[in-house]
Amino acid sequence: MSALPTPAMIDAPRSSSETDGGPLTPEHQRALVEANQRGQKVMAAGKMAAFNGWTSGIFAALTLPFALFSLTALVVGAGLALVAWNEFRGRKLLLHFDRGGPRVLGWNQIGFMALLIGYGLWGIYAAFTGPNPYADQIKAMPELEQMLGPIDELHLLLAVAVYGCVIVFSMIFQGLNALYYFTRRKHLDAYLDQTPSWIVDLQKFSAGGGG
């Protein structure tokens, strides 16, 4: 008859970290934390690109229905759709830690700025060279011409103010966006130069850029 095992003969259960060292060593965990800190500004740029892409896409969708009646709306709507597509393309490159991502996003904002400036200039040109918006009323009631004269001038003034604001604000906002994207290149370079490749691959998937 065999003897019952004594407590000393029974080994205490070992934790998974003691048996296989765990999925990551302390050094690996430390490297991952440091990589997360280095990549924060790159990830923030990806979120900015997502916001810009969705915003441009929504405005494109709202503009394109008017393309049936206006060539200007067709050009602007198509331009906005292209900006949205390119913004998402640049975001994908950025989340794949492609060094060309910041450049694509920066130039996309410059293209967006050019589109808005062109739209503003065309609006001002059309206001000054197009037909009088009150011509039909004046033709039907000639006595209103004296009263509508100042209103016509106000129409031109409002056109300059509105389209001028479009031009100025696009230069400010799209210009700053472009500068922001271009300056992300140095942060991306620092991340890639100082981060082990296995962490880069891991963070591609965790950020939604893998696949």
Predicted features, each with a name:
Residues 2-211:
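Topology signature of small-to-medium multi-pass alpha-helical membrane proteins
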